[in-house]
């Protein structure tokens, strides 16, 4: 799979996506990297620590988050994407579910669309992905937590996302799937999904796992956001062991990169 100018050999190793929230209210690091110079320094740190992709977000998706306008989101993400691309040769992902934001981000240099609604919120998203021929990550999400059979329902929901993408002209080789840990699921459902991650492989696409510092970890370990590094690392290792983690999206790049590398050495020989 090619993302930007970089080739990603799926199955060879686990790739690290470093999170850069350019927002004032993200659940984990809101407001921390709101200044472009500070953000660029953090990007360099993530790259030095093993990041293969930088995921830029301009709207928090934490529970109860405030929806921002397309214009506001564009004004947040475009300058930082341009700054990253100017200073570093690394693929950039745009974390958005809005087509206009995605298009402006790609024009600014973004190489991948990461949509927490799997192209279901804004149907023009698939058209943008097809138009620019960029890879896209389709995440499982729901407005509710009512499932008849959790894993079967997740697979069926993801199939719908895939069909939306392909009907718009997105190429098969440009699709990545995300089981959506922490979205549209209860604590118990998140644990069940984690324990059955290998089922996502049945759909035949690369998988991105995003569990970093999430409430599932906080509830399990009774820890605040800033103390969830070890719990996140555990989920990264589990994902790799289940052969269901080609990309891992994390805040704490160094710790997860090292854990992923060690796990890869053991299981991907």
Swiss-Prot record:
Mg(2+) binds at residue 21. Keywords: Folate biosynthesis, Magnesium, Metal-binding, Transferase. It comes from the Bacteria. Its EC number is 2.5.1.15. GO terms for molecular function: dihydropteroate synthase activity; metal ion binding. (7,8-dihydropterin-6-yl)methyl diphosphate binds at residues 61, 95, 114, 178, 214, 249-251. It catalyses: (7,8-dihydropterin-6-yl)methyl diphosphate + 4-aminobenzoate = 7,8-dihydropteroate + diphosphate. Residues 14-261 form the Pterin-binding domain. One of its GO terms (cellular component) is cytosol. Its cofactor is Mg(2+). One of its GO terms (biological process) is folic acid biosynthetic process. Belongs to the DHPS family. PANTHER family: FOLATE SYNTHESIS PROTEINS, FOLIC ACID SYNTHESIS PROTEIN FOL1. Catalyzes the condensation of para-aminobenzoate (pABA) with 6-hydroxymethyl-7,8-dihydropterin diphosphate (DHPt-PP) to form 7,8-dihydropteroate (H2Pte), the immediate precursor of folate derivatives. This is Dihydropteroate synthase. It comes from Clostridium beijerinckii (strain ATCC 51743 / NCIMB 8052).
């Amino acid at each position: 799979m090619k993302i930007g100018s970089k080739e990603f050999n799926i199955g060879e190793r686990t790739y690290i996506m470093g999170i850069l929230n350019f927002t004032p209210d993200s659940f984990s690091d809101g407001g921390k990297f709101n200044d472009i110079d500070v953000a660029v320094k953090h990007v360099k740190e993530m790259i030095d620590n093993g990041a293969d992709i930088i995921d830029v977000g301009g709207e928090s998706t934490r529970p109860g988050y405030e929806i921002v306008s397309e214009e506001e989101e564009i004004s947040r993400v475009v300058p930082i994407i341009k700054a990253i691309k100017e200073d570093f040769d690394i693929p950039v992902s745009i974390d958005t579910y809005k087509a206009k934001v995605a298009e402006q981000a790609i024009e600014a240099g973004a190489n991948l669309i990461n949509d927490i609604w799997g192209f279901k919120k804004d149907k023009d998203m698939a058209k943008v992905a097809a138009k620019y021929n960029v890879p896209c990550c389709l995440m499982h999400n729901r407005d509710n937590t009512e499932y008849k059979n959790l894993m079967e329902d997740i697979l069926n929901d993801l199939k719908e996302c895939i069909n939306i993408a392909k009907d718009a002209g997105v190429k098969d080789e440009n699709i990545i799937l995300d089981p959506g840990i922490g979205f549209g699921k209860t604590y118990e459902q998140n644990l069940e999904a984690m324990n059955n991650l290998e089922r996502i492989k049945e759909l035949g696409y690369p998988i991105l796992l995003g569990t970093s510092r999430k409430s599932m970890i906080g509830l399990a370990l009774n820890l605040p956001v800033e103390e969830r590094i070890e719990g996140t690392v555990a989920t990264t290792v589990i994902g790799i062991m289940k052969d269901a983690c080609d990309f891992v999206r994390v805040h704490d790049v160094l710790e997860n990169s090292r854990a992923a590398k060690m796990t890869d050495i053991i299981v991907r020989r």
